[in-house]
């Protein structure tokens, strides 16, 4: 789950969330996808993250997390059957 990965990136001394990019579904954006920097995140709440500009993004919209050009997490597509 994206929340667990973001918590780890935010609080574990090995990781630096400011070196990460988070892509999420955003209707109206190019390809309905928008990417923010980890430094744009002010805090993590139970069901969503709060950005420094005051907006919020639900975790279920996060599709991938990349740090230092390496995939850290990617949302799994739901299969049929």
Swiss-Prot record:
Q: Which HAMAP family match?
A: UPF0248
Give the superkingdom in one word.
Archaea
To which species is this protein native?
Answer: Methanothermobacter thermautotrophicus (strain ATCC 29096 / DSM 1053 / JCM 10044 / NBRC 100330 / Delta H) (Methanobacterium thermoautotrophicum)
Family assignment? Belongs to the UPF0248 family.
Q: What is this protein called?
A: UPF0248 protein MTH_1281
- Annotated Pfam families: MJ1316 (PF04457)
């Amino acid at each position: 789950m994206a929340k667990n990965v973001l918590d780890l990136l935010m609080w574990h001394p090995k990781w630096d969330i400011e070196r990460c990019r988070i892509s999420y579904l955003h209707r109206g954006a190019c390809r309905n996808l928008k990417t923010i920097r980890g430094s744009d995140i002010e805090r993590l709440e139970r069901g969503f993250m709060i950005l420094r500009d005051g907006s919020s993004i639900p975790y279920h919209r996060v599709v991938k997390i990349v740090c230092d050009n390496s995939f850290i997490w990617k949302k799994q597509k739901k299969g049929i059957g």
